[in-house]
Amino acid sequence: MLKRPSRTTVFTATATALSLLGDQALYALLPLYFQEIGLLPIQVGILLSANRWVRLLTNHLAEKLVEKFPVNLMLILSLTLGALLSLAYAYFSSFLVLLVARCLWGLCWSFIRHISVMGVASSTESQNLGQMMGFYNGISHIGNILGIILGGILFDLIGFSTTLALFGIISLLAVPFAIKSGLQTSNNITNQQQNYKSTKRYTALLFCGFCIGSVGPGLIMSTLGFILLSRYGTEVNLIGFVVGIATLNGLLLGCRWVLDTLGAPFCGAVIDRIGIHLGAQICFIVGLIVMLLLNLSESLAGLTLGMIIFFICGIALYSAFSAEASRLGAQVFARYASACDLGAAFGPVIGWGAYELVGTPNFVFILGAGLYAIGMFSAFSAFRQHE
């Protein structure tokens, strides 16, 4: 049975959601708009992954500074700077300026995510952590929904710059939620982390985090708009209405976050009950099969159904492994988050680089299936023992 989320969970998740608007809009819009501002395809991949590369360092910086400085202050500063960076996306077209802005966003996100997730973990009983992490992910990903879907719609109506500037202003509303969250963190969530790091389960946790990050947030998020454009052109007929490809891309990517908001708590509760070994195997296998089928299917209906199934698998995997990592303390979570970010950083570069080499965006799905196979074997070998 689902339990009611705490005030800390709800308020930090809401602040996180508001902070994500500009970042997520950029993932939906830049693959469609990069030629107008003079960027090359490989530069798109670099910009959409730069924030993740930076987090390989800043995740550990966040973990260290949380022990020394007030977490509320660090969260407020990160949310404020993150909102202002959306204005840089809106009004600058220089690759160098955009690259600096994306790196700074990576710094902000390291603090926002680490402080929020560890705050949820420190206020939750261990046996319910998957469910509470599902609530946090579900609520926070409302920001992804609005950033992607509303961003796509507003892009077709008012343009790239105005959309991102508007999202930057709205993101400042995250600050009051952070102030009222009653946030606390604990350095004593568990005493298991030093022993855990010596086991193959720890290695598998990092491998799985890499695979989850590289496929969903990396490959799919950064290339789906271009896949749609190459398959269907600039407009499609959707249930009797002609819509722009940016709107369609926003709707499809937004489905992921709608499903996350509605289903993440349930997925987390199920995996709390059946265990990470069985749950991870099911999700990796189904996701792998779906991506192979997406490579073969050209129909819009088939692509839509396949993406929905893939998103559900990704939601369950993210909730399960995030809960497993946060259960083991700040240091383990920081390293797991870095593994996810490493995968998410490689994803756009691999996807766009493969397109330049192979010449077909559909190859992204084959790459995704291969990475999920690695995750599947890692989880199978390391999480077989009784949990």
Predicted regions and their residues:
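Structural signature of the two symmetry-related core transmembrane helices
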Residues: 73-87, 168, 278-292
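Symmetry-related core transmembrane helices of the 12-TM Major Facilitator Superfamily/SLC fold
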Residues: 163-179, 364-380
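Conserved MFS/SLC helix-loop-helix module at the cytosolic interface between two early adjacent transmembrane helices
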Residues: 57-89, 271-274
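Residue-level signature of mid-helix packing/kink "hotspots" within the transmembrane helices
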Residues: 52-60, 144-145, 257-265, 344-345
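Intracellular juxtamembrane helix-capping segments at the cytosolic ends
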Residues: 111-124, 316-329
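C-terminal transmembrane helical hairpin of 12-TM major facilitator-type secondary transporters
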Residues: 277-321
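Short amphipathic helix-loop junctions that connect adjacent transmembrane helices
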Residues: 29-42, 222-246
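Pair of pore-lining "gating" transmembrane helices in MFS-fold secondary transporters
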Residues: 5-32, 201-220, 308
